[in-house]
Amino acid sequence: MTMAPPRTLAGFIDQVGGRAACLAVSRDPNAKVTILLFPPGTTRPAYVAKVPTTDAAARSVEREAEQLAEVGSRALGPVSTTIPKVVATVEHRGRPVLIMTAMPGQSMLAAYHSWRHTARRATVAADFSAAGGWLAGLHGAAAGSGQASLAQLLDGAADALSRRFGSQPDVDADLADLAGLRGRLARHRTPPTVVHGDFWPGNLLIERGRVLGVIDWESARLAGPPAGDLARFVTSYSLYLDRHTRPGRRVAGHPGLHAARWGAGVEYAIDGAGWSPDLARSFVMTGLERLGVPASCWRDVLLADVAAAAATADHDEFAWYQLTLFRRLTGRR
């Protein structure tokens, strides 16, 4: 925009002119409304407004604005064109609204849920290739000096699980498993890099096998262990493989996977056999080797992401499911 942005969301929308479209209303406790803004005569949005509906969501919006500003100040090479730029922070009903540049591309999640997309090796491999290529670009350009322990993948997880589930049975055993996992991860270090923090298919915008945009940076870290992004992509991609399959049925394209208990797709990726688990593990192993970490610790990295999700997920029910999944993966079924 050529003039200073106004102070309110309504004023910003008036200044842009054209059309406005509500893209999504989140169901999370930190729920936000996403609005696309189309200048007159355009077919693609130029701006995205993220509008919080609760005080918790407002803090999330402020955090994302801060992280995007910091990330935007780094020299990240070609990857920088795929990261939204902060245009302004305005106000709506007493809460901050983040205005960002809109990114091109279609959500990888939309393609993921299209007919038989995840049943075909070629399409799944293309998704992993696109995600891996983008992460290699980010982590390579943003690598700092020094070393970051992989144990940082579990920073705060034990305390969070104690607060969240301390009254539930067997949590002491969970914490013991977590301590052992943290100890194993502490043996390995990588150069610290910018970390997205929630690198799942719903946050990737793609076109023709390339990532054109990555959104939702509120969980970003400016100097963290990049292995977390590798793990989050695999666990989140695998989690929904059985979404369109009736309970008890075999999942199309995956002979070793049946739609059974929650998290079956993640168990399949980590402990199952077939082309899909092979792709998932290869994705993590290749990424770890690129970061200078032995590929053999791929399983611990994925376990750490499941535990971290149990500690940090917005929904208590989702967090509990992640914790029970962690128990199964650590042998306590």
Where do the protein language model's features map onto the residues?
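Regulatory N- and C-terminal appendages and interdomain linkers associated
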Residues: 1-25, 306-333
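An alpha-helical support segment within catalytic cores of ATP-dependent transferases
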Residues: 5-19, 144-196
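Active-site acidic catalytic loop and adjacent metal/ATP-binding pocket
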Residues: 24, 32-39, 43, 182-228
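ATP-binding glycine-rich loop module of kinase domains
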Residues: 31-63
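Conserved short submotifs of the Hanks-type protein kinase catalytic core
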Residues: 94-107
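Active-site activation/catalytic loop segments of kinase-like enzymes and analogous catalytic loops
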Residues: 228-287, 305-317
